[in-house]
Amino acid sequence: MSDYNRQFLFETKPAQGFTPAKKPTLRQRLANRINLLTGTAVLIVGASLGAAIGAGVGIGVYNYWTRPAPVIVNNAESVSWVTAAAAKASPSVATISVSSASGGGNGSGVFLTEDGYMLTNTHVVTLDGATSSVKIEVKTYDGHIYPATVVGTDPTNDLAVIKVSSPIKFTPVEFADSSALNVGDATVAIGAPLGLSNTVTKGIVSALNRTIQVASAAAPDNSSGGGLQFYSGSGDSINLRVIQTDAAINPGNSGGALLNQQGLLIGINVAIANAGGTAGSIGVGFAIPSNVAKRIAEEIMATGSASHGLLGAMVSDSANSDAAASFSVGAKVVKLTSGGAAEKAGVLEGDIVTKFNGVAITSASELTAAVRQEKAGAKATLELIRAGKTLTLSVVLGDAGNQ
């Protein structure tokens, strides 16, 4: 018996809740093929899979709608860690369908509580920032469908909490400590790419503390450009500090789970890199760290919204020399807000911030993302360079409010 068999108590025969694989009949294979060719086409819009919401937002057409496929174990003696992790976490991951008068889309989400609170992305429940008036349905891993409503959204970190209405109890996802991750750690992604519920892919942690910039889900999305985005837009943008993984992530994975080898949540999938056009996964995906996601989810469940730190300083990228102007080495303080957190901590204009809470800062975007992931009133440390000397300052972050 394998170690994973012992850990998750797989039986020699398919365990209860698992469906043995059956070879489809010729009639079934033909019917499936016809369905794929003639089914209703759905237009992908960014991270969520959906119909066109506004002019120019279409990226590609797909129609791979199928029934959910539970984790199938045909040979319990040879299960891998991927099978074990997927079997543990799959009941906690669901497919989310969102529709409005002007369009619709699909994403993923993870259950937070037994009574139906679920975490996903803001851009999933707002159809990439197009509307707040939506109808939401959630399809669980075993194919049951329930209505849901939005509890609160956090466009700053692209997270949202919804509440599923059901008399049954759900299986909450178990959180891991994302601050304990190492580059090279194994990862598993579960979600509904292209509408294919319960899809499992694997990879590794490719990088930590990566900062990406994406269109804000609180702003209308009227562009179809490429870049480091699941969704794009011509309006406001946000900076996100994320986990980078090479596990295959595609449109529809948004809001789904990124797991460790034990099937514990390490991140909420939010974006992929693409070169524009209709490209899917190229092995560069991003997830919001579980520690950040948990903090924001708890605040939204308690108050309907989440708080964010504010440094009270305008910053810009800082190069170490004119010859190396293409590479930023920190965040230079250009202007201080009178009475703000930075000024109170002793920061001066011209200082170059190189670390925030011990993590290297090489650009203004990285500092912005790091600060906004903290809650209002959080204590933090800044390492900065002033007149060639390195200083460490303690700061109590302000409240970003609606900024």
Please provide the spans of the model-predicted regions.
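Catalytic histidine site
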Residues: 46-58, 99-130, 178, 359
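Interdomain regulatory linker/hinge segments that flank or connect interaction modules
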Residues: 55-73, 214-217, 268-318
